Amino acid sequence: MIDSTCYPRLSRIQTPEDLRAFQESELRAVADELRNYLIESVGLSGGHFAAGLGVVELTIALHYLYCTPIDQLVWDVGHQTYPHKILTGRRDKISTVKHQGGLAPFPKREESIYDTFGVGHSSTSISAALGMAIVAQRNGDERKVVAIIGDGAMTAGMAYEALNHAGGMSPAPNLLVILNDNRMSISEAVGGLTKMLGRATGSKALNAIREGGKRIFGDKKTNATARFLRRWEEHWKGMFVPSTLFEEMGFHYTGPIDGHDLPALLGALKTLRTLKGPQLLHVITTKGKGYELAEGDQIGYHAVAPFDPQKGLIKAGAKKQTYTDVFSEWLCDMAAVEPRLLAITPAMREGSGLVRFSQEYPQRYFDVAIAEQHAITLAAGMATQGAKPVVAIYSTFLQRGYDQLVHDVALQKLDVLFAVDRGGVVGPDGATHAGNLDLSFLRCVPNMMLMAPADEAECRKMLSTGFHYSGPVAVRYPRGTGPGVVPSAELDVLPVGVAQLRHSGTRIALLGFGVCVAPAEQVGRRLGLTVVNMRFIKPLDRTLLLELARTHEVFVTIEDNVVAGGAGSGVAELLNAEGIVLPIVHLGLPDAFQQHASREDLLAEAGIDAAGVYAALLSRWPDLAVQNHPLSAVS
C-alpha cells in the first residue's frame, strides 16, 4: 500500500478542479509528488512507465489552465496518460491498471469523462480533436480542444492528413496541437522529421539568440520590446526549426520550449488559450524524466513489470523462449543463407524481435517509423525487384495497412512474408492491442496463404515455408511463450496445406488451430477423440477433412479468433462446397471486444482453454463424462 501522507498535496487532488485551487508557485511541488507517486505505484503494479514520467509538468499545466472536462484533451496513443488518470479521480486505482476489472492501460471513454477519446494506436489524436473542434465551432461553443501527440506518432501519415485538413479550413476551428518531442516512440524515433526536430532543439545559434535577449532585457520587457523579441526570434527560428513546415500547413507555431519548465509551459499555454485558429506548441521532454535509470534506458523502462524503484529493473536470468524469440533467431539464420531477405518493421524493433537482425544486417533492415501502410507497399515494391521482404508486424497494427496488403501485395501476388506477432488473445494491453480478428480478415484475401503454429518448432518451420512460397504469406503467432518445443537449427519446410493428425479417436474430431491445438489435444486424448493440428487456415487440408467427415459424427473447431469468418468458418465452407452435411461446433472468441486481463483469464473467459473445451463438449454430449476422465482432471 502507498502511504498517502507522503503526498500531502497530491492527496488533496480528486479532480482537476482541486488542482486549480493551488497557487502557481505550488505546482512545482505538486509535480514532484506526482512524479514520485507514479514511480512508487508503477513499481508496485507494473505498467507503462517512462512516457508518463516525461509529461508530468505538461499534464499539470494543461489541467491547471484548461477547464477540463469542458475543455477537451485528446491524448495520442495513451502510454503517457497515467499522470492524467491520477489527476482525474483515479489515483487510488492506478495500481489496478492492466489487471482484470481494473483501470484500462489507455484512455477509455467509458472509464472517465476526462477521457475524451479512446486510444491505443498512434497518430489518431489530431483527427479526433479536429472533429471535436469542428462540432464546437458549429455549435458556437467556446470550449478548447487540445491534441497531445508525440514526435514518434508524428511519423505517421494520418497525423499530416489531419494537419493538412485543419490548416486549410475556413473558417478555421480553434485547435491546439501539442507536439511532445522526446525523440522516441516505443523504440527510438526515426526518419526525416526526427532529424529536423533534432536540428531545431539542438541549434546553438537559436539558443544563443534567445539567451541574448534574456540578458539584454531581463524580466523587465515592455509590451513593445516583447513584441520585438518575438518577431526577432520568429525570424531566426525559421532558419533552424520546423515552424515553416507547420505554418505552411496553416498552423501558428510556438516553440520549442522546455516541457519540464512549468513557468514556461504555463506562460505559453496562457497565451495560446486566447488565440484563434490552429495552433501548434512544440515542447521538448525527456522520456523517463526524474528517474535516472529510466532516463538512461528509455526503451527498457517503456513498460515494466513490478520492480523496486530503489534497485531498478533486475535483468532476468535464462527465460523460456517466446515466439518472438523464435522469429528473431529464424530471421538471422535465414538471412545468412538467403541474400534476398530484407526485414521491415513499423517502429517495433524491440517488440518484434529485430534487434539482433538490425545489428548483424543493418543494410538489410528497414525501420519505417509508425507507418504501416508505407511498410507494406514498400515491401511490395521490393518484391517486384526480386527481393523477399519480411514484414514483422503486430496483428493489431496490420489492420492499419490492410488496404495495402490487399491492393498492393495480394492483388499482384507478390512474394511478401508477413510475420504477424501478437495474434489472437494478447491480454493486459486490452482491446486496442488484441489480435482477435486477423484470421478472419486475412483468410478472405485471394492469393493469401495463412498459417498458425501449435508450438515453437512449428513456428520456425512455417516461417521457412512462407519464405520459400511464391506469393503472399502470413505466419500468425501469439504473444509470449509456447509449450516449450525446442526448434531445430535447420530451416526445414512443411508441405503446403497438409494438417497433422495428433490423435486418432472416434465420434468427434477436434480441429485445433494455432495455440488451441494444445487444449484440443489435452481434452481429446482424455476423451478418446480425434485431434488434428490444422496448421493451415488457408489452404485447408481438404483430403484429411473429407476423410474425417466420412468417419466422424461431428467436427469441433477451436481457434483464438472471433468465430465470425474465422478458421472454423473455412471448414464449414469447405464441407458445404463438397455437399457434405455434418454438424460443426465452433469454439472461439466472442463477438465482442475483450477487455484487459491476463491471456490465461481471457482464454478461460472465452471457453477455449482446456477446461472450457471440456465443459463445452460435455454440455453437448454428457455421455462423454465417464468415470475415467472427470472434469477436475482437465485444467
From Swiss-Prot:
Domain of life: Bacteria
Involved pathway(s): Metabolic intermediate biosynthesis; 1-deoxy-D-xylulose 5-phosphate biosynthesis; 1-deoxy-D-xylulose 5-phosphate from D-glyceraldehyde 3-phosphate and pyruvate: step 1/1
UniProt xrefs under PROSITE patterns: TRANSKETOLASE_1, TRANSKETOLASE_2
UniProt GO cellular component terms: cytosol
Catalytic activity: D-glyceraldehyde 3-phosphate + pyruvate + H(+) = 1-deoxy-D-xylulose 5-phosphate + CO2
The protein's Enzyme Commission number: 2.2.1.7
Alphabetically ordered keywords of this record: Isoprene biosynthesis, Magnesium, Metal-binding, Thiamine biosynthesis, Thiamine pyrophosphate, Transferase
Magnesium among keywords: yes
Ligand binding (Mg(2+)): D151, N182
Cofactor(s) named in the record: Mg(2+); thiamine diphosphate
EC class name: transferase
A GO molecular-function descriptor: 1-deoxy-D-xylulose-5-phosphate synthase activity
Cofactor note: Binds 1 Mg(2+) ion per subunit. Binds 1 thiamine pyrophosphate per subunit.
InterPro entries (UniProt xref): Dxylulose-5-P_synthase, THDP-binding, Transketo_C/PFOR_II, Transketolase-like_Pyr-bd, Transketolase_BS, Transketolase_C, Transketolase_CS
Binding site residues for thiamine diphosphate: H79, G120, H121, S122, G152, A153, N182, Y291, E372
One Gene Ontology term from the biological process aspect of the record: terpenoid biosynthetic process
Family: Belongs to the transketolase family. DXPS subfamily.
Subunit relationships: Homodimer.
HAMAP family: DXP_synth
Function: Catalyzes the acyloin condensation reaction between C atoms 2 and 3 of pyruvate and glyceraldehyde 3-phosphate to yield 1-deoxy-D-xylulose-5-phosphate (DXP).
Name recorded for this polypeptide: 1-deoxy-D-xylulose-5-phosphate synthase
Taxonomy of the source species: Bacteria, Pseudomonadati, Pseudomonadota, Gammaproteobacteria, Lysobacterales
